[in-house]
Amino acid sequence: MIGKSDVLTLRSGRKVLSSKAVEAPIPDDWGYFRNGTIHIIQSSHQDIAWMDTPEYCRTERIEDIIIPALDIMREDPNFTFEMEQTLNLMEFLEAHPERRDEVIERYKEGRFVWGATYNQPYEGLASGEQLVRQAYYGRKWIRENLPGCDDRTANNVDVPGRTMQMPQILAKSGIRNLFVSRMREGLYDWYSPDGSSVLTYTPGNYGWATLMWKFFEKDAVTAFERLHPRSRLWSDYFRSRHIPPHYAVLMSCDATKPVNFAPVIDEWNRIAELAEVELPRLKCSTAEEYLALVDTPEAQMEEVVGERPDLWLYIHGPAHYQQTVAKREAGVLLPAAELFTAVNNVCLDGSWDYPRAAFDRAWMASIYPDHGLGGKNGEITDRIFGDSLSVARDLGRSLLDASLRKIADRVPEQAGNWVVFNDLQWDRPPTAVSCPCSASSATAANAWPSWPRACLRSDMPPTG
C-alpha cells in the first residue's frame, strides 16, 4: 500500500506470463516534508456582494456559512475556520448578539478568526488614510470590542494588485501577515519603500484547491495520492530557504460552505502513525497559525519591494466614475475634518465633545465598497455603494465646515476679510482663493458681474 512504483512480474518457471507496472496507492517519498505537516486552511471568500445583492450575501454568509462553522466547532474541537474581514464579524454580532461570548471564546482559542482589516479593498483606489482606516475598523475594532481578542493577518485574496505603502501601513498597525492570491505561490517578505515589511503568503489562486485539485473530497488514500506531487514540487523551495516543513492548502472559493474534513484527517494520521516510512501529518489550521510556524529567524523568504499595479483596470475608471469621485473627495475631506475638529477642541480647552460616532460612520462609509462592484444584480449593489460613498463625502464636508466656522469665529479679523486654512503638514506656497465679486472693465460703461477675484496668502504654516 505504501511504497514506490514497481513492475509486477508473473512467472511460470523461467517463462514470464505477465508483467505490469504497479504504483503504490500511497507514495513513500515525501522529500523535505516527510516529517512535516500539511495544514488545511479553510475559509469562504466573501465579496460584500457580487454573488448577489449585499443583503442576500450578508444573510447567506451569516446563516449558511458562519453559523454552520460555529456549530461544527461545538462538536469537533480540532475544526478551524476563518472569514476574511472584520465587517463580516460586525454583521454577525449585529444579527446574533446572543452568540457574542461564543465568538470571543473561539477567537481566543484561535479556531475561528476574522481578519485584521475592515474588508478587502482596491488598495490603489483608496487614499492613504482610507487604507489606514482598514486597520482602524479591523484589528483596532477587534481589540476594543472583543476583550482578549486580536488579529494579525490581513486578507485580500481576490484583487490582483498591491499598493506600495500597504505593507508599511499593516506593519505599523501591528499586523504581521498578509494573505493574498492571484500571484505565484510562495512565501514572501513584502517591503514598502521605508523598509517595513509583512510576511506575505499566496496559494496561487484562492479557489484552485476547492475547484480543481479537490484533495480531500474522497478519502485519505486519495488525499495522499493527490498531495504527493505538491511535496515534490515544493521540497527544494522550502529546503533551500530554510523554511520549516509546513505546507498549506487553502480550501476556499466564493461563498463556499464549511466542510469538516475530520474523517480524511483522522484516517491520514492513522496511516502515518502505522507506516514504517516517514509521512507528513495532516491538520486543520488558520492562516495565522500556519504563518507563525514558518516565520522563523532562519527562514529566508523571497523579497518583494514596491507595488503590483491592479490588473482589473475596468473597475477604476469610467465604469464607476461617480463612485470613484465621491470616494476620493471623502478621502480628502475626512482627514481635514478630523484635523480641524481637533484644533477647535484645543482652542476650546477640550470643552467641545469630539464627534467620534459621526467620524466612525463617515470613515466606514468611505471604505465600505470593497472590490465587488457590479456582479449579479449589480445595479442594486452599485447604487448602495454609491450612496455609501456620497454619505461619506457629505458627512466629511459638514464636519469640516462645522469645525472651520467655529475656529474662524475666534479669529479677530475685520468684517469682510477671509480666513484661509491649511490642512497639510507642511508649509503651503502662495495660494489663490477665488471668490465671487463684481468688477468693471477699463471703461466704466462696461460692467462684468461675478468676476472672480484672486486672494493671495503666502507663508501659510502647516496645520494652520
Indicate residue ranges for each PLM-predicted region.
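Solvent-exposed beta-hairpin/edge-strand motifs
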Residues: 435-447
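Catalytic-domain carbohydrate-binding cleft regions of carbohydrate-active enzymes
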Residues: 2-423, 443, 449-455, 459-463
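Surface-exposed beta-strand/loop patches in extracellular or lumenal glycoproteins
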Residues: 421-438
